[in-house]
Amino acid sequence: MLLVTILMLSGCGPPEFTYVRDRDGTTYFKVPASFAQIDASSLDLALSGNPPDSQAALQRARRVWATAFDQAEQPAIDHLFDSRAPFVYATVHKLTEEQRATVSLDRLRDFILPVTEETRTAYLTRALHTGRTPLFTGFEPISDRLVLLDNGARGVRVRFNYQIGATTQTFDHTAILDDQGATVSVMLITCRSSCFAARGAEFDEIAGSFKLLRLRG
């Protein structure tokens, strides 16, 4: 089960942050207490593309943990792709042997959305061949840097815009491969570009709290 602990301020004041760990207690972060936690299982399933009752979906449920937080007045999973208020999605994947052999920094960049040129081209090509209008257009890179943690874990943090319908959505994506090469932990923070421009410092604090912890034993 998801372990969520609330840090209380001195006295009887309201909580300032919600502190979150994944079910194995190895990935943790904090979000302002004003964010509402929502069930991310349906979102994770949609991102995977697996049919709900398939064997692949059942196996994925054993390997993948996910949660989401939304600051909107009416929190909803679909705010990941159209949010006037900040939305945070976090997931931890235990990699299969095949995935361990192919993981790379570019794979970390593309873990949720198409970011690298090769993956964006493949995404648009698939949409063209199926006759579907692509949901994501007008990609704009903002920043891209490596993340190196003290325990040997490494990853990337990329920020970019996508045009989704009539709005421009900004995404701040952090993906970290643990020091054993066994798990990938991902945090995606998003809201409309005007919201992101006004609240960038707050999002930096959330992303900066995203850490890995090596457990003893």
Each language-model region and where it sits:
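Soluble non-cytosolic domains of exported or imported proteins
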Residues: 26, 114, 118, 193, ...
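Sec-dependent signal peptide recognition
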Residues: 1-3
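Proline-anchored loop/turn motifs at beta-strand termini and strand-loop-strand connectors
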Residues: 24-45, 207
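Bacterial signal peptide processing site
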Residues: 13-15
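C-terminal motif of bacterial Sec signal peptides marking the signal peptidase cleavage site
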Residues: 8-11
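Conserved polar/disulfide-associated segments of primarily extracytoplasmic proteins
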Residues: 42-172, 184
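A short, solvent-exposed beta-edge/loop patch
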Residues: 176-182
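Surface-exposed amphipathic alpha-helical segments
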Residues: 35-38, 182-217
